[in-house]
């Protein structure tokens, strides 16, 4: 890449997501059609697909991939 060229950084993609209270999402992440419970943390490079459910007080760490229709209970560390 030449110094004069620019690039577009990837940000958080959130589409049709039900978010609880006090959620932290670190970019870049891709969340769509899922539910995230209260007091949860989503790290960078995480993808959570449609109909997945993340419980309360969960930590989903970097580079995690949560497939469609997966249910993760409360107080889990992934």
Cite the ranges covered by each PLM segment.
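Structural signal for interior beta-strand "rungs" in well-ordered beta-sheet cores
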Residues: 6-78
